[in-house]
UniProtKB/Swiss-Prot annotation:
Pathway: Carbohydrate acid metabolism; 2-dehydro-3-deoxy-D-gluconate degradation; D-glyceraldehyde 3-phosphate and pyruvate from 2-dehydro-3-deoxy-D-gluconate: step 2/2. Keywords: Carbohydrate metabolism, Cytoplasm, Lyase, Schiff base. Belongs to the KHG/KDPG aldolase family. Its EC number is 4.1.2.14. The record marks T157 as: Plays a major role in determining the stereoselectivity. It catalyses: 2-dehydro-3-deoxy-6-phospho-D-gluconate = D-glyceraldehyde 3-phosphate + pyruvate. Homotrimer. Its main location: cytoplasm. It comes from the Bacteria. This is 2-dehydro-3-deoxy-phosphogluconate aldolase. Catalyzes the reversible, stereospecific retro-aldol cleavage of 2-keto-3-deoxy-6-phosphogluconate (KDPG) to pyruvate and D-glyceraldehyde-3-phosphate.
Length: 196
Protein backbone atom coordinates (compact mmCIF):
# COMPACT_ATOMS: atom_id res chain seq x y z
CA UNK A 1 0.00 0.00 0.00
CA UNK A 2 1.41 3.39 -0.98
CA UNK A 3 2.49 5.81 1.75
CA UNK A 4 -0.04 8.51 0.78
CA UNK A 5 -2.87 5.97 0.95
CA UNK A 6 -1.70 4.81 4.40
CA UNK A 7 -1.43 8.41 5.64
CA UNK A 8 -4.93 9.21 4.39
CA UNK A 9 -6.40 6.09 5.97
CA UNK A 10 -4.74 6.90 9.30
CA UNK A 11 -6.21 10.41 9.19
CA UNK A 12 -9.63 8.97 8.36
CA UNK A 13 -9.32 6.46 11.22
CA UNK A 14 -8.44 9.33 13.62
CA UNK A 15 -7.54 6.91 16.40
CA UNK A 16 -4.81 4.27 16.26
CA UNK A 17 -5.28 1.49 18.81
CA UNK A 18 -1.88 0.57 20.25
CA UNK A 19 -1.90 -3.11 21.24
CA UNK A 20 0.59 -4.14 23.91
CA UNK A 21 -0.17 -7.56 25.37
CA UNK A 22 1.62 -10.42 27.11
CA UNK A 23 -0.23 -13.00 25.05
CA UNK A 24 -0.88 -13.45 21.33
CA UNK A 25 -4.42 -14.81 21.76
CA UNK A 26 -5.36 -11.96 24.11
CA UNK A 27 -4.01 -9.42 21.60
CA UNK A 28 -6.11 -10.92 18.78
CA UNK A 29 -9.21 -10.79 20.99
CA UNK A 30 -8.48 -7.15 21.85
CA UNK A 31 -8.21 -6.28 18.16
CA UNK A 32 -11.49 -8.03 17.30
CA UNK A 33 -13.24 -6.22 20.16
CA UNK A 34 -11.86 -2.85 19.02
CA UNK A 35 -12.95 -3.52 15.43
CA UNK A 36 -16.47 -4.17 16.74
CA UNK A 37 -16.31 -0.75 18.43
CA UNK A 38 -15.41 1.00 15.17
CA UNK A 39 -11.61 1.22 15.41
CA UNK A 40 -10.05 1.03 11.93
CA UNK A 41 -6.30 1.38 12.61
CA UNK A 42 -4.27 -0.88 14.90
CA UNK A 43 -0.60 -0.82 15.82
CA UNK A 44 0.68 -4.12 17.26
CA UNK A 45 3.75 -3.43 19.39
CA UNK A 46 6.82 -5.61 19.01
CA UNK A 47 6.90 -6.03 22.79
CA UNK A 48 3.91 -8.34 22.29
CA UNK A 49 4.84 -12.03 21.86
CA UNK A 50 4.01 -13.22 18.36
CA UNK A 51 3.55 -9.68 17.00
CA UNK A 52 4.41 -10.78 13.46
CA UNK A 53 1.88 -13.63 13.61
CA UNK A 54 -0.81 -11.24 14.88
CA UNK A 55 -0.12 -8.81 12.04
CA UNK A 56 -0.15 -11.63 9.51
CA UNK A 57 -3.53 -12.87 10.75
CA UNK A 58 -5.11 -9.44 10.08
CA UNK A 59 -3.17 -8.41 6.97
CA UNK A 60 -5.87 -9.34 4.44
CA UNK A 61 -8.78 -7.75 6.29
CA UNK A 62 -10.18 -4.75 4.43
CA UNK A 63 -11.80 -3.26 7.54
CA UNK A 64 -8.49 -2.59 9.28
CA UNK A 65 -5.19 -0.83 8.70
CA UNK A 66 -2.70 -3.02 10.55
CA UNK A 67 0.72 -1.79 11.58
CA UNK A 68 3.73 -2.63 13.72
CA UNK A 69 4.80 -0.52 16.67
CA UNK A 70 7.77 -0.27 19.03
CA UNK A 71 10.00 -1.32 16.13
CA UNK A 72 13.56 -0.53 17.20
CA UNK A 73 15.72 -2.68 14.92
CA UNK A 74 16.15 -3.48 11.25
CA UNK A 75 15.38 -7.13 12.03
CA UNK A 76 12.01 -6.23 13.59
CA UNK A 77 11.24 -3.92 10.66
CA UNK A 78 11.97 -6.72 8.20
CA UNK A 79 9.79 -9.15 10.13
CA UNK A 80 6.95 -6.62 10.30
CA UNK A 81 7.11 -5.91 6.57
CA UNK A 82 7.21 -9.62 5.76
CA UNK A 83 4.19 -10.22 8.03
CA UNK A 84 2.22 -7.63 6.05
CA UNK A 85 2.34 -4.54 8.26
CA UNK A 86 0.91 -1.60 6.33
CA UNK A 87 2.83 0.86 8.49
CA UNK A 88 5.76 0.66 10.90
CA UNK A 89 6.18 2.92 13.93
CA UNK A 90 9.23 3.40 16.14
CA UNK A 91 9.27 5.13 19.54
CA UNK A 92 12.24 7.31 18.56
CA UNK A 93 14.22 8.35 15.52
CA UNK A 94 17.16 6.26 14.31
CA UNK A 95 19.05 7.18 11.14
CA UNK A 96 20.05 3.51 10.71
CA UNK A 97 16.46 2.33 10.95
CA UNK A 98 15.27 5.09 8.61
CA UNK A 99 17.90 4.11 6.05
CA UNK A 100 16.98 0.43 6.30
CA UNK A 101 13.28 1.20 5.91
CA UNK A 102 13.93 3.28 2.81
CA UNK A 103 14.42 -0.07 1.04
CA UNK A 104 11.20 -1.57 2.44
CA UNK A 105 7.89 -0.72 0.80
CA UNK A 106 6.12 -0.20 4.12
CA UNK A 107 5.13 3.26 5.36
CA UNK A 108 7.42 4.32 8.22
CA UNK A 109 6.45 6.71 11.02
CA UNK A 110 9.44 7.52 13.22
CA UNK A 111 9.01 8.77 16.77
CA UNK A 112 10.24 12.20 17.82
CA UNK A 113 10.07 14.47 20.85
CA UNK A 114 12.51 17.33 20.31
CA UNK A 115 13.04 19.93 17.57
CA UNK A 116 16.43 18.33 16.81
CA UNK A 117 14.81 14.93 16.24
CA UNK A 118 12.14 16.51 14.05
CA UNK A 119 14.80 18.26 11.96
CA UNK A 120 16.71 15.01 11.52
CA UNK A 121 13.55 13.15 10.49
CA UNK A 122 12.79 15.90 7.97
CA UNK A 123 16.24 15.53 6.40
CA UNK A 124 15.27 11.91 5.65
CA UNK A 125 12.00 13.06 4.09
CA UNK A 126 9.63 12.03 6.89
CA UNK A 127 6.78 14.46 7.49
CA UNK A 128 4.36 12.24 9.43
CA UNK A 129 5.89 11.72 12.87
CA UNK A 130 4.86 10.00 16.08
CA UNK A 131 5.11 12.51 18.93
CA UNK A 132 6.03 10.41 21.96
CA UNK A 133 5.30 10.51 24.86
CA UNK A 134 2.65 13.15 24.21
CA UNK A 135 0.41 12.75 27.23
CA UNK A 136 3.23 13.87 29.52
CA UNK A 137 3.72 17.15 27.65
CA UNK A 138 0.17 17.90 26.50
CA UNK A 139 -1.48 19.67 23.60
CA UNK A 140 0.35 23.03 24.08
CA UNK A 141 3.66 21.21 23.50
CA UNK A 142 2.48 19.80 20.15
CA UNK A 143 1.12 23.20 19.11
CA UNK A 144 4.45 24.86 19.97
CA UNK A 145 6.29 22.32 17.81
CA UNK A 146 3.82 22.81 14.95
CA UNK A 147 4.75 26.50 14.76
CA UNK A 148 8.28 26.03 13.39
CA UNK A 149 7.34 22.76 11.65
CA UNK A 150 4.08 23.41 9.75
CA UNK A 151 4.97 20.72 7.20
CA UNK A 152 4.84 17.99 9.87
CA UNK A 153 1.77 15.91 10.68
CA UNK A 154 2.03 14.76 14.27
CA UNK A 155 0.54 11.55 15.61
CA UNK A 156 0.62 12.07 19.38
CA UNK A 157 0.89 8.83 21.34
CA UNK A 158 1.58 7.77 24.91
CA UNK A 159 -0.48 8.52 27.99
CA UNK A 160 -3.51 9.88 26.13
CA UNK A 161 -6.99 8.93 27.33
CA UNK A 162 -9.60 8.22 24.63
CA UNK A 163 -11.76 11.10 25.89
CA UNK A 164 -8.87 13.50 25.11
CA UNK A 165 -8.54 12.40 21.48
CA UNK A 166 -11.04 14.96 20.07
CA UNK A 167 -9.05 17.80 21.70
CA UNK A 168 -5.81 16.54 20.14
CA UNK A 169 -7.47 16.25 16.72
CA UNK A 170 -8.91 19.77 16.95
CA UNK A 171 -5.43 21.00 17.89
CA UNK A 172 -4.06 19.65 14.60
CA UNK A 173 -3.04 16.04 15.20
CA UNK A 174 -3.28 13.86 12.09
CA UNK A 175 -4.40 10.89 14.22
CA UNK A 176 -3.87 9.88 17.85
CA UNK A 177 -2.40 6.68 19.28
CA UNK A 178 -4.16 5.29 22.36
CA UNK A 179 -3.25 2.15 24.27
CA UNK A 180 -4.60 0.17 27.19
CA UNK A 181 -7.31 2.67 28.15
CA UNK A 182 -9.25 1.75 25.01
CA UNK A 183 -10.35 -1.56 26.48
CA UNK A 184 -12.77 0.09 28.90
CA UNK A 185 -14.36 2.29 26.20
CA UNK A 186 -17.73 1.43 24.75
CA UNK A 187 -18.67 1.86 21.12
CA UNK A 188 -20.70 4.91 22.18
CA UNK A 189 -17.68 6.43 23.98
CA UNK A 190 -15.68 6.21 20.76
CA UNK A 191 -18.34 7.91 18.64
CA UNK A 192 -17.21 11.29 20.00
CA UNK A 193 -13.78 10.60 18.53
CA UNK A 194 -15.09 9.56 15.14
CA UNK A 195 -17.36 12.64 14.90
CA UNK A 196 -14.46 15.14 15.03
Amino acid sequence: MESKVVENRLKEAKLIAVIRSKDKQEACQQIESLLDKGIRAVEVTYTTPGASDIIESFRNREDILIGAGTVISAQQAGEAAKAGAQFIVSPGFSADLAEHLSFVKTHYIPGVLTPSEIMEALTFGFTTLKLFPSGVFGIPFMKNLAGPFPQVTFIPTGGIHPSEVPDWLRAGAGAVGVGSQLGSCSKEDLQAVFQV
